[in-house]
UniProtKB/Swiss-Prot annotation:
<dbReference type="GO" id="GO:0005829">
    <property type="term" value="C:cytosol"/>
</dbReference>
<feature type="binding site">
    <location>
        <position position="87"/>
    </location>
    <ligand>
        <name>GTP</name>
    </ligand>
</feature>
<feature type="domain" description="G-alpha">
    <location>
        <begin position="73"/>
        <end position="407"/>
    </location>
</feature>
<feature type="binding site">
    <location>
        <position position="243"/>
    </location>
    <ligand>
        <name>GTP</name>
    </ligand>
</feature>
<comment type="function">
    <text>Implicated in the mating and sporulation pathway. Probably coupled to mating-factor receptors. May act in concert with Ras1.</text>
</comment>
<keyword id="KW-0378">Hydrolase</keyword>
<comment type="subunit">
    <text>G proteins are composed of 3 units; alpha, beta and gamma. The alpha chain contains the guanine nucleotide binding site.</text>
</comment>
<dbReference type="GO" id="GO:0005525">
    <property type="term" value="F:GTP binding"/>
</dbReference>
<keyword id="KW-0564">Palmitate</keyword>
<dbReference type="GO" id="GO:0005737">
    <property type="term" value="C:cytoplasm"/>
</dbReference>
<dbReference type="InterPro" id="IPR027417">
    <property type="entry name" value="P-loop_NTPase"/>
</dbReference>
<dbReference type="InterPro" id="IPR002975">
    <property type="entry name" value="Fungi_Gprotein_alpha"/>
</dbReference>
<dbReference type="GO" id="GO:0005834">
    <property type="term" value="C:heterotrimeric G-protein complex"/>
</dbReference>
<dbReference type="GO" id="GO:0001664">
    <property type="term" value="F:G protein-coupled receptor binding"/>
</dbReference>
<feature type="binding site">
    <location>
        <position position="380"/>
    </location>
    <ligand>
        <name>GTP</name>
    </ligand>
</feature>
<feature type="region of interest" description="G3 motif">
    <location>
        <begin position="236"/>
        <end position="245"/>
    </location>
</feature>
<keyword id="KW-0807">Transducer</keyword>
Length: 407
């Protein structure tokens, strides 16, 4: 197996650390029989596409949204990954960092979507409580019907006091929170943890979403969207494509002439089911996709960059949801390499050990010895961290381009 060159942004001081790891042993990527039984089968069409590199790709009329530039020297960056890995959040961060950001009109539109995220999560939790024969606290039962009722919201209209009262009460309900903390088989939106802590502010009649509110907002990506940014006198064209299985047939229309591929993985997905398939595991799906993509000839000249994302959520859940329950070959190590410790200087060994374990899982899948893949631990909602990481990503892309010209 080929080695994987990893580049990390130090979250404490911004220093970039580069480390070259030797070939990993086969045991790093092995799984038990019971674990393999849960691995989803990659769609045949995607396997065929990734194994070959046809001369002509037939167009299916996929519409690319955004401001496209036609310059031959543009840097094309493709964001790939399974659903709910954080690709669209990266795009929103790029808008905040390298463009004017979000207008008041757009912020008011996000207000409606944030409301829908909260209500959808509560409906899912109420359904899970019913399936588990768990009741709300007696004083909160009256709010069940309020949440399950069909709701509509407009960008300029305040939320009703009735809905606020119900949401406020249920987000504090201890029995609902217990189901929430144990609901690894739920396709619960990660952002619900964040919005729970801001209910009073969100339901204020004058509420306008903040940058963080927008970054946490979950919107399913359908089709292909494009944003162009001017960075250091270079035009970067970022393509975000839907990660759920139903969207992957559209990926091929972005595969040609890719300068850099950013593959996103939700670290917090090690114990979560897929949004589109309750029997599938998010991390297993990501490993399967990465295996096919990083070894594909489509990207033989592209910089390969891996974002192990949602580190903040991973740190929160690793103590309440054991990794070994979902990945039986996992063993906590006594110490981790310096580059892992640098990423999480305040984290305990359980968190660092988990980070290193999943890093090695992805590292071991790169079977092309000549290909360097660069890895970053990220929290896509952390703007300052993403800014440092993106500086490193730009360096990686430019270095890869220079090597291509030389060889």
């Amino acid at each position: 197996m080929g080695c994987m060159s990893s580049k990390y942004a130090d979250t404490s001081g911004g220093e970039v650390i580069q480390k070259k790891l030797s070939d990993t042993q086969t045991s790093n990527s092995s799984t038990t029989g019971s674990q393999n039984a849960r691995v989803p089968v990659l769609e045949n069409w995607l396997n065929i596409v990734l194994r070959g590199k046809p001369q002509n790709v037939e167009s299916s009329g996929v519409r690319v949204k955004g401001n496209s530039t036609s310059g031959g020297n543009d840097i094309k960056v493709l964001l790939l990954g399974a659903g709910d890995s954080g690709k669209t959040t990266i795009m929103k961060q790029m808008r905040l960092l390298y463009s004017p950001g979000f207008s008041q009109v757009v912020r008011k539109q996000y207000r409606v979507m944030i409301f829908e995220n909260i209500i959808s999560s509560l409906c899912l939790l109420l359904e899970a409580m019913d399936n588990s024969n768990v009741s709300l606290l007696p004083e909160n039962e009256k709010y069940r019907a309020v949440i399950l009722r069909k709701h509509t919201s407009q960008p300029n209209e305040p939320f009703s006091p009735e809905i606020y009262e119900a949401v406020h009460a249920l987000t504090l309900d201890t029995k609902l929170r217990t189901v929430q903390s144990c609901g690894t088989n739920l396709s619960l939106l990660d952002n619900f943890y964040y919005y729970q802590d801001h209910i009073d502010r969100i339901f204020d009649p004058q509420y306008i979403p903040s940058d963080q509110d927008i970054l946490h907002c979950r919107i399913k990506t359908t089709g292909i969207s494009e944003e162009t940014f001017l960075l250091n006198r270079h035009h970067y064209r970022f393509f975000d494509v839907g990660g759920q299985r139903s969207e992957r047939r559209k990926w091929i229309h972005c595969f040609e002439n890719v300068t850099a591929l950013l593959f996103l993985v939700s670290l917090a997905g090690y114990d979560q089911c897929l949004v589109e398939d309750n029997s599938g595991n998010q991390m297993q799906e990501a490993l399967l996709l990465w295996d096919s993509i990083c070894n594909s000839s489509w990207f033989s000249e592209s910089a390969m960059i891996l974002f192990l994302n949602k580190l903040d959520l991973f740190k929160r859940k690793v103590h309440i949801s054991p990794i070994q329950k979902h990945f039986p070959d996992y063993q906590e190590v006594g110490s981790t390499p310096t580059f892992v410790q640098t990423q999480c200087p305040l984290a305990d060994n359980a968190v660092r050990s988990g980070m290193y374990y999943f890093y090695l899982k992805f590292e071991s899948l790169n079977r092309i010895a000549s290909r360097s893949c660069y890895c970053h631990f990220t929290t896509a909602t952390d703007t300052s961290l993403l800014q440092r990481v993106m500086v490193s990503v730009q360096d990686t892309i430019m270095s890869n381009n220079l090597q291509s010209l030389m060889f």
